[in-house]
Each structure stands twice: as C-alpha cells, then as structure tokens.
Amino acid sequence: MKIVVLGTAGYHPNETRDTSCIMIPELGFVLDAGTGMHRLGKLLVGDTLDIFLSHAHLDHVFGLTFLLGISVTRSLRRITVHGIGATLQAIDRHLYSEALFPVRPNFNMQAFSTDPFTVGDCRITPMPLAHPGGSIGYRFDCGFICELSALWKM
C-alpha cells in the first residue's frame, strides 16, 4: 500500500508545502482536502474518489474547490466526501456559498456517526480527536498485510 503525502503545512501553504492532504492512490482515498489536492489528478488510479475529512477548518477543506477541475479533466464514476454532519454542513453553507465559490463540483456528501462503516473492501472506524472545534481521526482496515518473514530472521 502506497501512501502519498500531498500536504503537511499548517494553516496556510507556502512555497514548498501545501496544507493537509494525504492520498492512498490504489484505494482512491484522500485524507483531508487541503491545498495539496491540486496534485491529485496525476495520482488517481481508479474511477472513484473518497475524501475523508477530519474537520472543517479551511486548511483541511479548501482543496474541495479543486474538485471542479478534477471532475472536468478526469472521468470519475463517483466522488464522495465523508465527514460528520456538522463538517459537511459547514462546507455546504460556507465554502460553497454564493459569495465564496458559487459553482459546486459534482460530488456526494456522506455523513456518518462514530460507528464503523464500509467503503469498497475497507472498514473505516471514525474516532473523535482533541482539536479546537472538534476533529475526527480514521482507522482503515483494508485486508492488506505485508510479508514480514524476512524481518523475523534478522
């Protein structure tokens, strides 16, 4: 399983770093939608994209506006943004407001509680984290295991 770090900067990007965005290309999973989302198109492997948001602070969601370009240049069967209800409502109400970004890209929003849910072959377990305004962390169980027998012989 390959994990690609697209952004790790704090509240705003700088010349060398984008804001929070991590991708697992072979699953089409993205963790947080910071400004690193602008590099997503080159890394997409399949025809689905699932974005898991930790919270609604701008450095974690601004990249959702880049979905407009991605949906035009890539033929994706489905784009789903996952988050708790309050996070998704804040995005719909504020980020995609008429005054800020009046064109909403074509994607579904899927709200969840803290109960585990499934996307494809992966079981996702959300868990609350300590962060101003609240935040969600994720555990992904995707049936992936490494062959480690060589390590045990060392």
Regions of interest found by a model, annotated:
Residues 1-147, 154:
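Binuclear metal-dependent hydrolase catalytic cores
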